[in-house]
């Protein structure tokens, strides 16, 4: 006896016992849960953060900052030449505060603050990192780009899953004997502006 949902969001195979214990909020709903917990982070603040992210991404793309990080992918077409995808398609050049303000809440119709504009899109991508020991790196003649000094995991209630990195970051910094101010560059997965803020 199986219940299944055809969806890109949320649970495909809901477990009624898990639903009783934790709820079955989809990711966008968990972002709205965070917004309810943090009412001082307004829709306008979320939109401003999202706008800045789009602007920074476009500036980085235009300056070639990702040129060595993105491998072009060739996609055969039924007719004509293959389509070459070599640029992140998510950042929008025409994003503005006025445009973002016009978007309706996507996950909570009444009083919601999370929209398609201050959320990440549903798009495909992939990433790879080669991790080796210092000895193996030397043996292969590799020049390291980074060194792992600490790692950590942290759990949070599923209904606010987007806050998990906060506790994990604090634990990793403590293990490394570092403070956030000691870090020169932070790469943040901005699934939702509310989560990042």
Predicted region positions:
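Phosphate/pyrophosphate-binding loops at sites that engage ATP/ADP/AMP, CoA/4′-phosphopantetheine
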Residues: 34-40, 137-141, 170-185
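Alpha-helical scaffold segments in soluble metabolic enzymes
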Residues: 29-33, 52-59, 99-102, 168-171, ...
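N-terminal extracellular/periplasmic Venus flytrap/periplasmic-binding protein-like
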Residues: 44-139
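Active-site pocket-shaping loop/turn-to-helix segments
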Residues: 18-26, 38-51, 91, 111-127, ...
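Flexible glycine-/small-residue-enriched beta->alpha junction loops
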Residues: 1-34
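Conserved beta-ketoacyl condensing-enzyme motif
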Residues: 1-6, 70-87, 159-160, 180-197
């Amino acid at each position: 006896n199986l219940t299944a949902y055809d969806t890109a969001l949320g649970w495909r195979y809901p477990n009624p016992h898990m639903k009783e214990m934790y709820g079955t909020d989809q990711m966008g709903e968990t972002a709205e849960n965070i917004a309810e917990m943090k009412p001082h982070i307004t829709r306008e603040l979320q939109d401003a953060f999202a706008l800045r992210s789009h602007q920074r991404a476009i500036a980085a793309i235009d300056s070639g900052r990702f040129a060595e990080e993105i491998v072009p992918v060739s996609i055969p077409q039924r007719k004509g030449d293959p389509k070459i995808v070599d640029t992140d398609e998510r950042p929008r050049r025409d994003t503005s505060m006025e445009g973002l303000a016009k978007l309706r809440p996507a996950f909570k119709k009444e009083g919601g603050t999370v929209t398609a504009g201050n959320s990440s899109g549903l798009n495909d991508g992939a990433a790879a990192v080669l991790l080796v020991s210092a000895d193996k790196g030397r043996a292969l003649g590799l020049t390291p780009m980074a060194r792992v000094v600490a790692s950590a995991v942290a759990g949070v209630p599923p209904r606010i899953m987007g806050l998990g990195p906060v506790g994990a970051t604090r634990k990793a910094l403590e293990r490394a004997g570092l403070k956030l101010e000691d870090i020169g560059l932070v790469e943040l997965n901005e699934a939702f502006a509310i989560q990042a803020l």
